[in-house]
């Protein structure tokens, strides 16, 4: 879906929609986007949820609702999805794939082509590269069902026909940004890592304008 129109905003103020804006990483994405001078809209479930998202325009609605998504997308250039869901060892998880499927349909309807979507280390072909504790303890006990939905989410994005980037952070922490990170698609010899939410947010926002990782799924880590 990449064409000249997908670059029209490269030299102008980017108008982005952030999903998952009330999560720990989502809040950093919003604040950093505002600091960059972006026009930021957020889709949140209530006005109360939008508190603290300074400089962003709140739109009330559910990320799985087609009508709310189309309203939120109107006039936007790009979408950043930082949607997450709690660890769920027992119940089935469908929120990420359901919301992403609805998002893709709404983006096509509103002719918004750029999607930067955060999933995580362990999704898709990064499975088995989380290190011993993550792969052998955390993943099977807490995250198996969440990652089954992340895998489906990634497949929906890959098959969307949009100008997408899938971002797979390693284990997240709240430490200050280091500035320098590694973005990997060849995971040979890689087994585990960590990265700050601050650095993840910066990398994700860079993908709104940059085509370097278009149609790729980099794992990002320190």
Name each region found by the language model:
Residues 95-96, 167, 195-205, 216:
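Substrate-positioning beta->alpha
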């Amino acid at each position: 879906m990449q064409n000249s129109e997908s670059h029209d905003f490269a030299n102008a103020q980017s108008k982005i929609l952030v999903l998952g804006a009330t999560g720990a990483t989502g809040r950093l994405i919003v604040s950093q986007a505002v600091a960059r001078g972006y026009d930021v809209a957020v889709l949140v479930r209530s006005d109360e949820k939008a508190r603290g998202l300074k400089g962003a325009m709140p739109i009330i609605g559910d990320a799985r609702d087609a009508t709310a998504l189309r309203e939120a997308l109107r006039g936007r250039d790009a979408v950043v999805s930082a949607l997450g869901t709690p660890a769920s060892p027992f119940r089935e998880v469908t929120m990420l794939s359901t919301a992403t499927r609805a998002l893709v349909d709404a983006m096509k309807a509103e002719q918004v082509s750029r999607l930067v979507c955060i999933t995580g280390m362990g999704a898709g072909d990064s499975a088995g590269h989380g290190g011993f504790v993550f792969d052998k303890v955390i993943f099977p006990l807490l995250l198996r069902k969440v990652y089954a939905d992340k895998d489906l989410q990634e497949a929906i994005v890959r098959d969307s026909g949009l100008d997408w980037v899938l971002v797979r952070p390693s284990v997240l922490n709240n430490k200050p940004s280091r500035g320098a990170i590694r973005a990997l698609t060849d995971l040979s010899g890689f087994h585990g890592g960590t990265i700050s939410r601050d650095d993840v947010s910066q990398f994700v926002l860079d993908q709104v304008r940059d085509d370097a990782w278009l149609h790729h799924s980099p794992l990002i880590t320190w």
